[in-house]
Each structure stands twice: as structure tokens, then as C-alpha cells.
């Protein structure tokens, strides 16, 4: 048996931020990680690394990363004011996001980024996917101009180094299975450590071990039939165990339990994410495409918004299609604009010099239906509006359903290419109800459960239906800090 003041379950971004926040108060901190050292880091290790936080100007960014003065002046850095952040989060969640949780997330996001830098996290401008050269000037769009150096894996490695230097004890291949609870407060956890059942005692336990996206039985139970067939973009270790052990002692479930972050993903990707090429299966250039199902029909508004605001919901739409697949179809006019992943290895791709040839090559697609769809789509494109991929250009279709609201180009210039996609699930939205100021888990009567805290993807109530890109890592950072400081403060208060 080992004893700590604070015991953190998990070792991703939220868990590490919780551990560091608690450790900086002087308490003894331990971490339990189900994975091996090589696989550790939860979903954070697979994340792209973009960070959505509130900022008004480049001066706010310079508190987080070093930006040379000439670069600062010669670039349009966009903004993501507190009001703009609220607007985006409320809009994409259909105004269902919890007001207290969203306020904490948004108002503490910038200070959280500054703090993360002080803990060893390294941030750099996100030139690759979130900026364009317009009239000789680099212009950011999408409201998240910074990313983590080295992506999510780099973030995990940097924060792990800091945690180890500060004396946080990390136990690998140690999967928490239940809470030690005396009916009044949580006293620790029982865990499987390399096949043996062991106990860890603590004055406070912080659950930060992710959702249930890697559990096909829970996916089917809560997300619905067919979800057992989805690919998992990240770790295989997020099985919902942290949520279950809290519910078992009376914690309150909260949030969009049938909701999830799920994207268009390489059709023949592995069952789980692969850290070494975690970005290769991305297929995020679909706003420039038409997406076709097995019947040869379109089924979403590909140009509803920038992919930052639609990618997390469109994977579910692909999963609903016959055979759980779709094809993203492009012509030569937009091919140079596609993200680099479309030119990588292990890409399900076909190419043809005519639409008829493409139709015959698209595996599992009704060729006549596809050609009819393209004819009707091309005729519906509003050609008097100028195409501009850097803006919501309003170049749309008229008279067809589903409409395409932006970036509608005719599919008429050879060669034509189609890329096969399926659904890749990232994380689940349902979880536990917490106190937004302390991170304490609440019971069914909304009273705090003494000694139990939570952070990260297993916190319910923040995301509903959809998700604005870059918010997940920042949410883990913010609520990890809150849970860590809350747990430590309760210990010191006696």
C-alpha cells in the first residue's frame, strides 16, 4: 500500500496539469497510468496540439510564446476575445453548454496558457493549417493561432519532465479499478498493477483518465447501434472506468451522453490511433469537396463552416451512411489546396480523367447515382460569387438539398480524385458533474463528494452535439489546474 496527499488517475494533459497544480502547493502527489511508458499520455498524445484560448492581440500571444517584433507586426494574428469564444462555444453546442463550466473554461484559458508555459509547455505559431498568405501578408483565421511544439505528444513529454523534476511519483501499467470509499469520503483507489490488485491511499483522488470512446460496449450502449464499428483515433485505454467508479459511489452523471467528437477518418486506418503517424488519417479538407455515400448521394453541407466548427460532428454523419463509409471527391481546381495528409502514405485514393471512370472506380458506390448527383450539384453552384478558401465566401448552391453554403466549386476539371473515409471517434461528451470552482465531483443531490475531483474528458456538461476545434486540450488544462489546486486546498484546510 502506498499513500499520497493527492492521487491523480491518468497521465494525459488534464492529469498532468492537475498533478503539477497540486504539487506546486507542496503536497505529495502520485499518478496512476494504465498504459506502459511508451503508450502513456492518454488521448493527449494523439492530439494535433492546437489551442483555443481567449486573446485580444499579439501582445497576449507574446506572453505565451516568443514572437519576434517584425513577425508580430507583419502578421494579422486574428483574435479570440472572451465574447468571441463564448459566441463560438454556445453556437456550436446549440446553447446547451453549462454556463458555469464554460465561463471557467473561457475566462481562465489565457492565464492557463501562460501557466502551462511556466510548467515547460512550448507553444509556437500555427502557421501550417490556420493561416494564409493574402496580398503578401500572412493572415490567421479560425481563432487559434498557436499550437504545441511537437503536438500533443510534445505537450505530454514536456509536462511529464516537469512533473518528474518536481517529485511527482508516476506508476505505469497501473489501472485504477475502483474507489476506496467509506460512505462519507473517498480514501484512495484499488488498482491492477501488472496483474496484481493493490491499494493506493490518498486524502484526495482526481479522476482524469478520459471518457469511454475506446469501449465498444459503452459506445453502443450510450451513442447507439453502429458505434461499435467506429475507428478510435486515440488511445485504447479510455474505457470509461473513471466514470464508472465514480458513478458506483453515487456521483452525478452529466452532459451529452449520446454525444461525441468524431471526424472523417482514413477509411482503412487501424482500429486505434498510432502515435508515430497520428495525423496521417486526417481528412479535413472536405469543405472543398462533395462527400458521396454508397448511393452516390451527398449527405451533408460540406461548406457549412470552416472545418474547425464542423469536423467533430461530421464523422457521425459518415457512420450513418450505408457501409459506414463515404468518398470525398475533388477536381484539379482545388487539389493544390488540400492538406498534406491527402498526399501521404496509407491513403485510400482513386484518380481518374473522367467522372465516368471515377464513378466506376469508387468501391461500393452507385455509379449512376453519383453522376446524377454531380450533374445536379454543378448546375446548382452559384458561379457569380468569387471563390475564396480563406473566408466564408458565400459561394453556395441553390435549389438542391443538402445545400453547400460556402466554397462550392463545380466538379468539372480533370483529373478527378476521391478519398475514402469512415468515422474516427476522438472522445465522448458525457461524464461527471463537477463544481466549476473546485473541480469536486458532485453527487446525485449536487453536493460535493469529499475527496473526489475530476478533470478532462470525463467532465460532462461542456460539449453538446459539436465542438470548436482546439478546445479540448485547453479544457483539460483549465480544469486540471482547478482540480489540482482544489484538492490541495481542501487538504490544507483540514
Task: Provide a role label for each language-model segment.
Residues 99-197, 215-218, 264-268, 381-410:
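Conserved redox-cofactor binding core of oxidoreductases
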Residues 239, 243-365, 369:
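An anion/pyrophosphate-binding glycine-rich loop and adjacent beta-alpha core
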Residues 193-196, 200-269, 439, 470-473, ...:
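Glycine-rich loop(s) and the adjacent beta-strand/alpha-helix scaffold that form part
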Residues 45-80:
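N-terminal glycine-rich dinucleotide-binding loop that anchors FAD/FMN and/or NAD(P) in oxidoreductases
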Residues 72-136, 353-376:
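Rossmann-like flavin
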Residues 1-14, 30:
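Beta1/beta-strand and adjacent pyrophosphate-binding region of the FAD-binding site
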Residues 24-44:
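Glycine-rich FAD pyrophosphate-binding loop
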Residues 178, 369-466:
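A glycine-rich dinucleotide-binding beta-alpha-beta segment and adjacent secondary-structure elements
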Amino acid at each position: 500500500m502506498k499513500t499520497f496527499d493527492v492521487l491523480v488517475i491518468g497521465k494525459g494533459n488534464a492529469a498532468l496539469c492537475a498533478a503539477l497544480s497540486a504539487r506546486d502547493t507542496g503536497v505529495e502527489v502520485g499518478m496512476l497510468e494504465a498504459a506502459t511508458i511508451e503508450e502513456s499520455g492518454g488521448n493527449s498524445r494523439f492530439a494535433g496540439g492546437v489551442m483555443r484560448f481567449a486573446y485580444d492581440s499579439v501582445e497576449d500571444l507574446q506572453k505565451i510564446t516568443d514572437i519576434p517584433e517584425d513577425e508580430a507586426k507583419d502578421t494579422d494574428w486574428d483574435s479570440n476575445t472572451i465574447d468571441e469564444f463564448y459566441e463560438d462555444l454556445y453556437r456550436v453546442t446549440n446553447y446547451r453548454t453549462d454556463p458555469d463550466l464554460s465561463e471557467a473554461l473561457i475566462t481562465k484559458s489565457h492565464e492557463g496558457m501562460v501557466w502551462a508555459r511556466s510548467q515547460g509547455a512550448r507553444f509556437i505559431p500555427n502557421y501550417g493549417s490556420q493561416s494564409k498568405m493574402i496580398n503578401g501578408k500572412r493572415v490567421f483565421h479560425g481563432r487559434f493561432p498557436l499550437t504545441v511544439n511537437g503536438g500533443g505528444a510534445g505537450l505530454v513529454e514536456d509536462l511529464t519532465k516537469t512533473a518528474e523534476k518536481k517529485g511527482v511519483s508516476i506508476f505505469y501499467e497501473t489501472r485504477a479499478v475502483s474507489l476506496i470509499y467509506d460512505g462519507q469520503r473517498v480514501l484512495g483507489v484499488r488498482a491492477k498493477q501488472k496483474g496484481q490488485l493493490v491499494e493506493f491511499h490518498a486524502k484526495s483522488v482526481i479522476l482524469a483518465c478520459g471518457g469511454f470512446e475506446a469501449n465498444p460496449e459503452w459506445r453502443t450502449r450510450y451513442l447507439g447501434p453502429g458505434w461499435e464499428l467506429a475507428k478510435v483515433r486515440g488511445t485504447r485505454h479510455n474505457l470509461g472506468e473513471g466514470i464508472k467508479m465514480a458513478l458506483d459511489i453515487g456521483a452525478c452523471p452529466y452532459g451529452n451522453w449520446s454525444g461525441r467528437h468524431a471526424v472523417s477518418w482514413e477509411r482503412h486506418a487501424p482500429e486505434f490511433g498510432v502515435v508515430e503517424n497520428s495525423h496521417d488519417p486526417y481528412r479535413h479538407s472536405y469543405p472543398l469537396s462533395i462527400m458521396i455515400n454508397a448511393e452516390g448521394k451527398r449527405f451533408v453541407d460540406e461548406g457549412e463552416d470552416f472545418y474547425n466548427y464542423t469536423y467533430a460532428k461530421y464523422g457521425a454523419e459518415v457512420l450513418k451512411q450505408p457501409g459506414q463509409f463515404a468518398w470525398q471527391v475533388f477536381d484539379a481546381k482545388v487539389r493544390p489546396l488540400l492538406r498534406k495528409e491527402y498526399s501521404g502514405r496509407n491513403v485510400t485514393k482513386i484518380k481518374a480523367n473522367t467522372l465516368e471512370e471515377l464513378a466506376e472506380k469508387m468501391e461500393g458506390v452507385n455509379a449512376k447515382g453519383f453522376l446524377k448527383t454531380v450533374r445536379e450539384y454543378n448546375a446548382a453552384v452559384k458561379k457569380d460569387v468569387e471563390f475564396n478558401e480563406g473566408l466564408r465566401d458565400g459561394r453556395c448552391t441553390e435549389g438542391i438539398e443538402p445545400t453547400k453554403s460556402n466554397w462550392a466549386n463545380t466538379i468539372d476539371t480533370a483529373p478527378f480524385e476521391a478519398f475514402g473515409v469512415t468515422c474516427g471517434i476522438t472522445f465522448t461528451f458525457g461524464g461527471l458533474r463537477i463544481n466549476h470552482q473546485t473541480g469536486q465531483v458532485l453527487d446525485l443531490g449536487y453536493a460535493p463528494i469529499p475527496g473526489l475531483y475530476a478533470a478532462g474528458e470525463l467532465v460532462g456538461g461542456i460539449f453538446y452535439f459539436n465542438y470548436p476545434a482546439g478546445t479540448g486540450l485547453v479544457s483539460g488544462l483549465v480544469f486540471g489546474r482547478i482540480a489540482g489546486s482544489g484538492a490541495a486546498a481542501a487538504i490544507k484546510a483540514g
